[in-house]
Amino acid sequence: MKITCTDKLKKDIVSIAYSLFLRYNSNRNFMKGLAMYQFDPHIHTISSGHGTNCTITDIAKQAASIGLLMVGITDHGPATPGAGRASYFRNLAYAPKTRCGIEILYGAEANILDSNGTLDLEDEILEVLDYVIISMHQPTYKPGTTEENTFAYINAMKHPKVKIIGHCDDVKFPVDYEALVIAAKHYDVLLEINNASLSPDGYRGDVSGNVKSILEACKKHNHPVVLSSDSHGLANIGNFQYAFEAIKTNHFPESLVLNSSKELFNTFLQNK
């Protein structure tokens, strides 16, 4: 019998192999680029409208299988084509906080819509979420100048539920990282080191220089970062390989990487 290796089968094989690899390495120090951190704060489900058909329960099962303790469900805001409507995010307030033994945080990756930092979710909905990631995407945000983009991020991060700036390494949206980190420290917001951006098949351009600038500014101002997979689906949940390599290459203190403790991150969420 001939077996055809479809794209889905290939993804399933990669997912299984990755799970086994992490399980094998779960008791080793993360010196080879796949850090066994405790949580992944940036994961997407079918409600993001693209890239996956997995559910929150699917994600919890996968997270449990690779030894994570906590995940953040952060689907794209409603301005993203095909993403969940406002009612989806509103109802997350009633979702179970634990699945398959994994602590679940419910958030959103809200779209910044303009240079004033307007988000695509109303305050009443943001208030019921555990935290919010703010990001720039096309076509929901038109790339501006360095000053305009930085101004937009700073305005958006003023909302008390905003705790992470997502993939601000994107070369399409130039940013003044020094000014951004100073503001982020003031407003208790983390800059994300996004593994998907740094991966060889990333689509945000050559972000290595921008990531270096982010880490240098955060180190200078003693401000922590958070690593994320930005996984759309199961295959890359908890995969921080390239983000971890950036941390090591740029000699960034591991003490400033919040993924090492879910308690530290949960405490950080209470600030502001």
Enumerate the predicted regions with their spans:
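Short, positively charged and aromatic/hydrophobic N-terminal segments
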Residues: 13, 21-27, 32
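Active-site mouth loops of central-metabolism enzymes
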Residues: 43-54, 138-144
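Short acidic/histidine-rich active-site segments
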Residues: 223-237
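Histidine/acidic-residue-rich catalytic or RNA/ligand-binding cores of hydrolases
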Residues: 49-53, 83, 174-181, 201-215, ...
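His/Asp/Glu-enriched short active-site or ligand-binding loop at hydrolase and phosphoryl-transfer sites
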Residues: 190-203
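Histidine-centered catalytic micro-motifs
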Residues: 38-49, 165-169, 229
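Extended substrate/RNA-proximal surfaces in nucleic-acid metabolism proteins
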Residues: 64, 77-193, 248-257, 264-272
